């Protein structure tokens, strides 16, 4: 009997996302319920954004939640390497195989040519897609350009008529027309694969039998299925999980909800409660009880109990459930966990240098730096009263800074200050006009340690969370303001 093997393959391009943890949990439970193996693979082919720091955060976040893997970059295994950036020769081999079989082809189009192609198609009211012009090149022309070292990508051929039947474990057979599919790039000019080729090759070579992934990938499933057919490989069983949603039913995003697992750890949530809550995202226990452990979920796991309606990720409900877990702890364990959370040595060492020179007794630390250990803060609304700026301008400055911070890839003090300065300069203000607002929103106080130091230590999700809280305290942002300010954001360097 074939051993069930599932996997999670996150990209290390930022803080570990709750959506990644959600999909990891369901893959883990499915594998363990069937006596199988759960694998961790790292999709780090985006060399500009991928970092080893983010990779380690993924490891730490999943382990904090109690999800372990039997094979992966940090534990090894018989199917390594488990980082896609270390498997380049493997992808090159299989891409070339597709070319030789006539299922893929080199494309020499420049970015300018592709932009022009899309513009012409849009002008005609057509869906922008690659028009296949490289297929018209003769073999001799292709070889000449390859020999000359001309930059190129490898694209896959796709049918132009008919439908692809996608067998989904949740929805049954889903029909998707082939004319919706583009001639997907498989290998980029830098010699690294795109998601589609790497996914299929890795899943096959690693013996993955079942793939549970987010439903946002369902529309592109025909490309994956076609690649399996081109290679002549058996495809794994596919399951497209419903996406997590904000309370307003929009797709879960950091603009409306904190999305980092690290944020919830820092906020003092219990990992058991986090797993429990994610387990209730579109799934339920046979007896419908709300509180259950990871092992109880594994023991009772059945994909037929997954609901296709978009599950709502609601922090208030998560907080309620976390309270149930906290109150059920023996008091000794409650005290022990509180100590571990509040007096984390690594976190304390980040804070201490910014506090030590500002106090004369230890008792002065809490009033000065207590905000480092809180989830949110409750600043007095009077702290946002400004001699120079109107209430609307105050909210505009804070909202624009929040948006700029959302685009920050590297969370460092100098880059944080760069975002603040960019907004201030564009609005023709001075730094001293904005910094008191940041102090109030982030620390809840008029003065404290350097606010940019504090933001760096608190991290991106907690910083953004407090800015959103402050904006809500000031009445929020109207739809009209949101639209106008987003246009303004586009012109800020």
Swiss-Prot record:
One of its GO terms (biological process) is glutamyl-tRNA aminoacylation. Monomer. Pfam families: Anticodon_2, tRNA-synt_1c. Belongs to the class-I aminoacyl-tRNA synthetase family. Glutamate--tRNA ligase type 1 subfamily. It catalyses: tRNA(Glu) + L-glutamate + ATP = L-glutamyl-tRNA(Glu) + AMP + diphosphate. Keywords: Aminoacyl-tRNA synthetase, ATP-binding, Cytoplasm, Ligase, Nucleotide-binding, Protein biosynthesis. A motif ('KMSKS' region) lies at residues 251-255. One of its GO terms (cellular component) is cytosol. Catalyzes the attachment of glutamate to tRNA(Glu) in a two-step reaction: glutamate is first activated by ATP to form Glu-AMP and then transferred to the acceptor end of tRNA(Glu). It comes from the Bacteria. ATP binds at residue 254. GO terms for molecular function: ATP binding; glutamate-tRNA ligase activity; tRNA binding; zinc ion binding. PANTHER family: GLUTAMATE--TRNA LIGASE, GLUTAMATE--TRNA LIGASE, MITOCHONDRIAL-RELATED. The keyword Ligase applies. This is Glutamate--tRNA ligase. Its EC number is 6.1.1.17. It is found in: Cytoplasm. InterPro entries: aa-tRNA-synth_I_cd-bd, aa-tRNA-synth_I_codon-bd_sub2, aa-tRNA-synth_I_CS, aa_tRNA-synth_I_cd-bd_sf, Glu-tRNA-ligase_bac/mito, Glu/Gln-tRNA-synth, Glu/Gln-tRNA-synth_Ib_cat-dom, GluQ/Sye. The gene is gltX. The keyword Transmembrane does not apply. A motif ('HIGH' region) lies at residues 10-20. Signal peptide: none annotated. Its main location: cytoplasm. It comes from Pseudomonas savastanoi pv. phaseolicola (strain 1448A / Race 6) (Pseudomonas syringae pv. phaseolicola (strain 1448A / Race 6)).
């Amino acid at each position: 009997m074939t051993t069930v093997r599932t996997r999670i393959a996150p990209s290390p391009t930022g803080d570990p996302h709750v959506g990644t943890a959600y999909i990891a949990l369901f893959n883990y439970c499915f594998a363990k319920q069937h006596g199988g193996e759960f694998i961790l693979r790292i999709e780090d082919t985006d060399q500009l954004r991928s970092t080893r720091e983010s990779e380690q955060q993924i490891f730490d976040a999943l382990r904090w939640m109690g999800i372990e893997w039997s094979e992966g970059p940090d534990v090894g295994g018989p199917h390594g390497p488990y980082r896609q950036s270390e498997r380049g020769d493997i992808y090159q081999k299989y891409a070339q195989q597709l070319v030789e079989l006539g299922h893929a082809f080199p494309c020499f189009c420049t970015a300018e040519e592709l932009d022009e192609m899309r513009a012409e198609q849009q002008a005609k009211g057509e869906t922008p897609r690659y028009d296949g012009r490289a297929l018209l090149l003769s073999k001799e022309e292709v070889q000449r350009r390859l020999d000359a070292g001309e930059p190129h990508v490898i694209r896959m051929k796709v049918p132009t008529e008919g439908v692809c039947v996608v067998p989904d474990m949740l929805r049954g057979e889903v029909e998707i027309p082939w004319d919706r599919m583009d001639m997907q790039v498989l290998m980029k000019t830098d010699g690294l694969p795109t998601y589609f080729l790497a996914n299929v090759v890795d899943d096959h070579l690693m013996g993955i039998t079942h793939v549970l992934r987010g439903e946002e990938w369902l529309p592109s499933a025909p490309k994956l299925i076609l690649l399996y057919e081109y290679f002549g490989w058996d495809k794994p069983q596919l399951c497209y999980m419903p996406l997590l949603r904000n309370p307003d039913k929009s797709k879960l995003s950091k603009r409306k909800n904190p999305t980092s697992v690290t944020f919830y750890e820092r906020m003092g949530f219990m990992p058991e409660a986090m797993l429990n809550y994610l387990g209730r995202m579109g799934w339920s226990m046979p007896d419908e009880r709300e509180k259950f452990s990871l092992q109880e979920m594994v023991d009772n796991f059945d994909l037929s109990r997954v609901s296709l309606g978009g599950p709502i990720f609601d922090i208030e409900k998560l907080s309620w459930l976390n309270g149930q877990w906290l109150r059920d702890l023996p008091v000794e364990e409650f005290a022990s966990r509180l100590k571990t959370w509040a007096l984390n040595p690594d976190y304390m060492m980040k804070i201490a240098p910014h506090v030590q020179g500002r106090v004369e007794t230890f008792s002065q630390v809490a009033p000065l730096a207590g905000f480092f250990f809180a989830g949110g803060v409750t600043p007095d609304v009077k702290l946002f009263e400004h001699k120079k700026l109107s209430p609307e301008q105050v909210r505009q400055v804070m909202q624009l800074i929040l948006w700029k911070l959302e685009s920050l890839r590297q969370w460092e003090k100098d880059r944080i200050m760069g975002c603040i300065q960019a907004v201030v300069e564009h609005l023709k203000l001075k730094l001293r006009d904005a910094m008191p607002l940041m102090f109030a929103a982030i620390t809840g106080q008029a003065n404290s340690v350097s606010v940019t130091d504090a933001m760096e230590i608190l991290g991106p999700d907690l910083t953004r969370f407090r800015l959103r809280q402050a904006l809500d305290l000031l009445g929020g942002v109207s739809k009209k303001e949101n639209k106008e300010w987003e246009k303004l954001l586009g012109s800020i360097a």
